[in-house]
Amino acid sequence: DQYCASIAPTDKNQYTGLTKDYNLIVICAESFSPYVIDEQRTPALYKLANGGFRFHNYYCSFPNTTTNGEYALCMGLMPDMSRTKTASSFDVSRSNYLPYCMGNVFASRGYPAYAYHNYYGTFYDRNHTHPNMGYTFRAVGSGLDMPLSWPSSDKDMIDASVSEYLDSSTPFCAYYMTFSGHYQYNWDNAMSAKNRDAVCNLPYSETVQAYLACNMELEYALEDLFEQLERTGQADNTVIVLTADHYPYGLSESQYNELAGKDIDTTFEKYHNSFLCYIPNMQPVDVDTYCCDIDILPTLLNLFGVSYDSRLLAGKDILSDSTHVAMLADQSYLTDSFRYNAETGTAQSYDTRPVKDADVQAYCQYVSNVFSFSTQVLNNDYYAHVFGKSAAKQTQTYDFSDITNPFEEASALFAAENGYMQAKSRTEFGAQTSAAYGEVLRALYRMAGGTQSLSDAAVITWAQEHALISDDVFAQDTVTYGSVSRLFLRYLADQKIDVSLTETDKTQLAQIQAGYTELDDTTCLAMYWMRKHAILQDNDLGQYYSLADQVLNRAQISRCLQGISSLVQSTS
């Protein structure tokens, strides 16, 4: 309380309420870089970048980890940097009172607010965190009817969701966390492969071409969005905001230099990114203020005329005359006169003038306070204390300590919470234990609508009756990449899912079979199909087919089961 009382609040300014009663669409773009934007190749992104405010000194604070960048954007607070991906700041916030998140702001006015993600909702616990921010949340397998791939299509996400809010008679808020820009950047990346022809003549290496290709899916999503806004008469009253979650760490230092067309300073300049704030029919306003992720929320609150106590957010309205600093995750920072490297403890001005030690110390303390304040707000549910309210408490059934991979955590939660697999305890899933046929078959039985508790013998009989396994399979047998691929393909066919191959698939499969003659045709086909539909995967295509005889653990199987369930739901 004393710290907040000591902070000077920001004043209203000429832009306060500029977009009051407008619609708002916020896009957190996976691994986005400003070097993606090109007037000819990406006209929709170019339109976003040049209509409204142009923030020339915006920095994305984080080198990696989507959940941190997304948290800073949504909360106006720095995440607790001591936390891991599977025990993230968002996880903690799921039961906090969050009055300033844009979803809650719109919902408090009686307006619809939606959030979408084109991967599973259990990933990073978004199925719990995003409703607490005021959003009706949709994701693959939980209300968002679209195909899943690795990565999934941003265009498909936009196309599957816009009808839910564009016909609204009141202002609406829609939030998107995209996926198409996710690494690895090669032609095995589903979005890179899909858009290869759009970039194949560009003068870049394969990796950089693949990065640009997968980001073309974001461009096509935005083109569709603009078209739908025009169709529904919402184009002139919809603000669109886009920024990155983090630096595109899937590119090496030299590859990022290649993309930029120059050598990029790795301490500061690589974090220079885009905060696109498109306001229709507005002449561009150039803003040179130094700013970062946490400043977006208070800037939007001011633009939308929302009354808020600016002292309660770590970020500052960029359009105000407050103190402005672009802060990075390691507490390095940039001001309007110098930049400070936290690793070396040195400051450098933008010209030849020396930097005063007192200024460095003052800004270092300010930045440290921002991080500390943000952590205290999070861990102590501070807004509940200030406003005398609380969020609806959400029971966290499981908190698995034996899983550190957020992809596996999401799937383990899915499997345990739906009763498809049994966790060893509330805190242990048994992630590294080898998966056995009996458990996998019981999960498929339950997915198929079975309600009985089947013994090993009974579930084997059920599987044989449905032609899922041969007579020589026993419940205790472990499952491998190859055997589980065959099993899942038979299960999908039994569920009346079309598992046929296109002519392109057949050509690609023939090439794979020629390179892996030790694999029988049935196994090769099944593994190909599973990988194509992101049920089984490995970043290295060659390595993937070499795993046919490798045993899967329970965490890996849970991920497969989530993929199978999603596929059945989306095609039923």
Q: Predicted segment positions?
A:
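N-terminal propeptides
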Residues: A392-S572
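N-terminal hydrophobic targeting segments that direct proteins to the cell envelope
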Residues: D1-C4, T571
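Solvent-exposed soluble domains appended to multi-pass membrane proteins
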Residues: Y3-T397
